Amino acid sequence: EGVLYPGTEIRDFMRAADLTHISNEVSFYEGCPFPNPDYSGFIFCSDPSYIDLLDDLGADIIELTGNHNNDVRALYKVDSVPFTLDLYREHNMQWYAGGVNVTDAKKPLLIESNGNKLAFLGCNSYGPEMAWATADSSGSAPCEDLGWIADEVTRLRGEGYLPIVTFQ
């Protein structure tokens, strides 16, 4: 029934928010095949046209803690994360907890809205390891020992931010 159909019942609710946060579990990939109902695996991607649903819902903030953001790399040997981040940027969406490398993935998303200073941080503890960003590859921020998150929360609170931390 079209790419916007899944948002039919929640559209007005989502659009009414000052900030709309969505956890998007998968990367966009231009070669993403149409879903096959007989496929029994757990390798996921989204056709770039599906960004229209996030636009329609008014998505502002995209969480990338998901463990399927690197599925395209595992199956097709293509790193689709940079393309995905460019697509978010083109659609004026900001993201956190994922990036082109581990430094980028661990960077907090800082937003000031209605007089509030918000800092979004997140990480993936679930894995598998191929889902995690490294010094040389894209993916979700690995939780590791959580010390880095504790340090960031302390630093950000000292700067007047309210940290919002998400985990998968």
Describe every region a protein language model picked out:
Residues 1-168:
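Acidic, metal/ion-coordinating pockets
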